[in-house]
């Protein structure tokens, strides 16, 4: 794998994660085709795991080339008639933070579902 998956600290969208390329590369165009294809394949695996676990009606993907220090994509589950449905997601709405135990449980569930 060429990626690392991090549970996003703010969980207004249950299951939100950030998929980060393992090396310090700033933009997708700096990756060779095999690396880029592997990164997107990993993204697909993570997306399928999130759909299986949380059953969102949609997944939004965000890449912030001017903010992120590495190639990174936010994968944001969206739920109909809930927060920010039919709107772009905020980078950090500061609304929902879990306990450490809840983060650990969610991370374990996601990790298991990705395998």
Where in this protein do the model-derived segments appear?
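HIT superfamily nucleotide-processing domains
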Residues: 1-115
